[in-house]
Structure formats: C-alpha cells, structure tokens
Design a protein with these regions (language model features):
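Non-catalytic connector elements of ABC transporters
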Residues: 58, 68-180
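Internal alpha/beta loop-helix hairpins
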Residues: 2, 7, 12-81
Length: 180
C-alpha cells in the first residue's frame, strides 16, 4: 500500500491477518458495521459487546453495578464475585452489565503490594501449552465458569500443575464494561 500509494480493501475472516495487515478494520455483524477503527482500538477499546466478544479472546462475566464512585464501579457477578472496574461512563447502582477481560490482562500470583488489583482464587483445570501463546484454563472454586489466563513462557510459572489452587488478579483499568 505505502509503496504503490493506493488504498486497498481486503476482505478476510482471519482476525489475525486483518489486525496485522490493516490501518483500519471494519467489524460487521449481520450486514451492519459494528465498529470501524484501528486494529489497536478494536482490540483495546471495543465500542460494543459484539466487538468485545468477536475480536480476540476474552473472559466474560455478567452481573450488576452494586456501587459507583465517579467512574469507578463495584460489580457483583452472577456467581457472587465482586470486582472493581473503571467505567467509560457512570452507571447507576443496579445496572446490569457484561464485563470483558483479556487473558493477558490477568496476572498469575500477583504482587501483594499492588492495591488496584481484583484478586481471587482459581483452580487450574488445564495447561494449554502453545509456546508464546500458552494459556491456563482455570475455574474459580465451586464454579464451572472457565477462564483463560495467558501463561508467560519465562519459566516463572513452571511449578504450576493441574489441580493447583492459585491466586490471580487484574487491574481495575483492564476490564471493559457494557450496559446490557
């Protein structure tokens, strides 16, 4: 494109290809544009729940706002977990929401000194080894909800085994909430 000086429209169903090759990507849903944006914005700042679910991997919870302070909300999931999350807009108490969180936003055995983290225990269900794309498949105790967590291949987590109970956490700025 840059060498020829021409704009191209390329249609693909391969998300990775679209994100790597494009200056702008259009995400369509049932023949309508959901979001037209840079690959970085589609991934990091989806504007609709459809785009959040469609582009990349996500962990998702449904729940409601139980408390708000400016643009910070306390969310309770349907499973009873409580998280703090930064909102783009203030939502009143009782608002039903969907919360999305990327697997790479979750920290394994986070530093206890990090005060802005949502922390909770999980049980390792599977270790999905795929080199740099490795993941942990985990469940919160007494829950069948499956969560994916990026597993860095820096040897720091080689001790983790299936059935281990570990603590995970994520920064309150990492979650993306949408009113349902």
């Amino acid at each position: 494109q840059l060498q020829v000086g021409t704009t191209f429209i390329y249609i693909t169903h391969d998300q990775s290809e679209a994100l790597v090759m494009s200056d702008f990507v259009a995400v369509m849903n049932q023949g309508r544009f959901e979001q037209v944006d840079t690959p970085q914005n589609l991934y990091n700042d989806p504007q609709t729940p459809f785009v959040a679910r469609f582009v990349g991997e996500n962990n998702a919870w449904s729940g409601q706002v139980v408390l708000t302070e400016d643009h910070l909300a306390h969310i309770e999931t349907r499973e009873g977990q409580r998280f703090r999350v930064r909102l783009k807009q203030t939502l009143p108490q009782g608002t039903q929401i969907d919360l999305f969180l990327r697997p790479e936003a979750m920290l394994i055995q986070p530093d206890p000194g990090l005060s802005t983290l949502n922390r909770f225990a999980v049980v390792v269900k599977a270790i999905l080894f795929d080199g740099a794309n490795s993941r942990l498949l985990v469940n919160p105790p007494q829950s069948d909800r499956e969560l994916l967590i990026a597993l860095p291949q820096n040897r720091q987590y080689d001790h983790i085994r299936v059935a281990d109970r570990i603590e995970v956490g994520w920064d309150l700025n990492s979650g993306i909430c949408f009113k349902t």
